[in-house]
């Protein structure tokens, strides 16, 4: 079940159109209304679809406290700075948090700065943040974008190896997408680097297909590099390697079942959704 508590995000990443859509608006539904909605659900496993549940710490604390008596299991999207508050992490675990989606995006400092996500570097490093999630039994779904001006063909390998070594529950390796309304789109359009504008209206658009000209690879190499990284991450051997995590991925029978089911579904969907010319 999908449940929404709040809208908007306090950050302004270069590739994201959320700020263009909501502006500086950060709003939450009354917690009592969200609780009532969850109580009406028969199956108590939910995905909280907020762009960033941790947009405001005070509201996040109040929300997590309200979830505790509901005995719900939940997943959602958070920014990496949530790991800086140990008490909040304990509360997340107590409230039923099973997994989080975290936008790591890149291991390259220059790329993070260009995408206006340099704040990812402020919190003791990725490894320390991942450890804190795992120490609280929370599985991590890491996402990466490829195609920024400092990215090259080696970037796929580095991000893939990092995701496997970190034993991410799931991971996605996406081509940078110039979404209308995002600063990235305006910049690439001004530089004449869009392949097909407006690409989102094209009947030829396929999932995972690069829509601009990167600086250090061809669009075809960007598309193929992301596809190969997804495929390798979801190989049976790497699924097995990532399952060897008794703190999070296999910390309980429920975690283990969710890990295996999600990875097998992901493996199937990669082939099903990918562009057909690869």
Q: Which role fits each region the language model picked out?
A:
Residues 87-92, 116-124, 140-148, 181-189, ...:
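Noncatalytic linker/hinge segments flanking ATPase motor cores
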Residues 183-186, 193-278:
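Radical SAM enzyme core and accessory elements
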Residues 20, 38, 167, 192, ...:
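A general structural signal marking secondary-structure boundaries and capping sites
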Residues 11, 58, 110-115, 146-154, ...:
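Flexible glycine/acidic-rich beta-alpha junction loops that bind and position SAM and/or redox cofactors
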Residues 73-75, 141, 170-173, 240:
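Acidic/polar loop patches that form or flank catalytic/metal-binding clefts of enzymes
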Residues 1-141, 148, 153-154, 161:
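Radical SAM [4Fe-4S] cluster-binding motif and immediate context
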Residues 164:
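Catalytic-core region of carbohydrate-active enzymes that cleave or remodel glycosidic bonds
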Residues 1, 143, 249-253:
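Structural motif marking the loop-to-transmembrane transition
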């Amino acid at each position: 079940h999908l449940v929404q508590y709040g809208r908007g995000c306090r950050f302004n990443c270069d590739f994201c159109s959320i700020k263009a859509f909501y502006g500086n608006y950060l709003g939450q539904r009354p917690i009592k209304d969200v609780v009532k909605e969850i109580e009406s659900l028969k199956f108590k496993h939910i995905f909280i679809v907020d762009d960033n549940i941790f947009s405001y710490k005070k509201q996040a604390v109040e929300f997590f406290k309200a979830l505790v008596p509901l005995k719900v299991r939940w997943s959602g999207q958070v920014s990496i700075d949530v790991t800086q508050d140990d008490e909040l992490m304990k509360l997340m675990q107590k409230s039923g948090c099973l997994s989080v989606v975290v936008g790591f995006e890149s291991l390259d400092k220059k790329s993070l700065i260009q995408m206006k996500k340099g704040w990812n570097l402020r919190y003791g490093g990725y490894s320390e943040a991942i450890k804190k999630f795992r120490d609280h039994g929370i599985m991590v779904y890491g996402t990466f974008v490829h195609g920024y001006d400092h990215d090259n063909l080696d970037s796929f390998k580095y991000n893939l190896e990092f995701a496997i070594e970190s034993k991410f529950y799931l991971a996605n390796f996406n081509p940078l997408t110039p979404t209308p309304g995002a600063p990235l789109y305006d910049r690439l359009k001004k530089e004449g680097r869009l392949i097909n504008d407006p690409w989102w209206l094209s009947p030829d658009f396929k999932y995972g297909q690069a829509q601009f000209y990167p600086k250090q690879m061809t669009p075809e190499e960007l598309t193929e590099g992301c596809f190969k990284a997804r495929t390798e991450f979801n190989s049976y051997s790497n699924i097995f390697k990532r399952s060897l995590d008794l703190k999070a991925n296999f910390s309980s029978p429920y975690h283990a079942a969710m890990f295996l089911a999600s990875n097998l579904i992901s493996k199937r969907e990669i082939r099903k959704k990918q562009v057909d010319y690869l």
